[in-house]
Each structure stands twice: as C-alpha cells, then as structure tokens.
Amino acid sequence: MAEPLLELDHVTAGYHGQAVLRDISLAIAEGSVVTIIGPNGHGKSTLLRTISGLVQPMSGEVRFDGQSLRGRKVHEIVALGVVHIPQGDLIFPDMTVRDNLLMGAYLPDAHAEADTRIVEIFSLLPKLEERQNQIARTLSGGERRMLGIGRGLMTGGQILLVDEPSLGLAPIVIDQIYAVITRLRDEGRTILLVEENVSRVSEIAESIHLLDNGSFVWQGPPEELQLHQEILETYLGG
C-alpha cells in the first residue's frame, strides 16, 4: 500500500499548554478529498493550523510526503507543498486582485512560475480575471473568498487545506465555490476540507471525519453518514 501523502500520528495540540486536539490520527492518500466536520470551537481550524505549522504539536507527529513537519517554520511547510487557505476573507484590501494573487507566489519556485500560474487561476476563476485590476476591498464577499482560494493556489502545492469555504456566503455563491473545489478534485488535487455544510461536502468527499471536543468520534464515507441521522442531530443540529 502506498504511503499517505499526509499523516497525523496521535497528535495532541493546542494553545498555552491547553490541549484542543487530543490524540488525533489521520491518513490522507494523494488525490483524495477528506472532510472534517463538527461543532464550532471543537478544534477543526486548530487541526489545519497544526498541519500548516501555525500551531506546534504537544505530542505526536505530522508527516507530509514521508517527512516530519515537527519544528519546521510555516514557509518551509509551504515550500514542501502544503497550502493553507484559512477561514474568512484574508486578503490585502488596498491592493489589486492581480497583486493579491502575486503575493501568493512569494516562494522562489512559485515566483518563477507566477505568470503561468496566474493564467491557470484565471481559467479556474474567470471572475478574478475580469476583476484583476480592481481594488480587492471593493469585491463582493464571494469574490473575496475566491481571491483567497486563488492566492493559495499561486503557491502551487500538493495538498490544499481549506477552512470553511462556504461560511457566511449566499447559496448561489456557495455553488460557485464548490464548483471550483469540484474541478480541483477532478484535476487530482489532494484536499483536506473543514466544513459545516454536510450536504455539500457529501457530494465531493471520499471520507468524512466528525470532530467533537478535540477528538474524532465518527469517520466513514458520506453515504454512511447520511444513514446516521442521530449523529447529525447530536453534533450538528440535524
């Protein structure tokens, strides 16, 4: 069996000595889409932050492509191929759309391929091409979310860590965002997706992991989760 692209081995992590994640183990194969669901404030974003180096594990190991990430700086983890697209609209508001995208190509390898990558991103996100000379703060909420995704893609990367891409967006915009994620999946991208919109992730994920109070309490394929209405009602309010 091939080694997983990303592996968390009994990871405990948190802030100021207080554990938020407890004994988390997870293996993600290359080219797969895995989703983390669960109540707010129970560790989903912390899990992504631990993988990307923003939070260091208290114990356990995070490995990417066979290499330990322990002690590595964030930019070193990005250079290995881990792209973290955080929750919300973290953009440079007074820069143009194009310049925001170019900020994602700050690593030497990405910078050398910036012109090629920006063409690819405009193909994936044509609205950004239309808005490329527009100041970012004038974009709609959905366009800002797409800009954040596009900037993350500018780094290249083998795996995308995407944190609640549908948060606070209108249904029609969520459709657009998930069309992009679906296309990335179809292109063979490896994606770890944090989301509360169970119906949407059930359409694209190969496996779903339910995180509650810092631990996985259920995991399996989406079609199996739909058979356990009591789980959805208990942890996600239905």
Model features per residue range: what roles?
Residues 152-153:
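ABC ATPase C-loop
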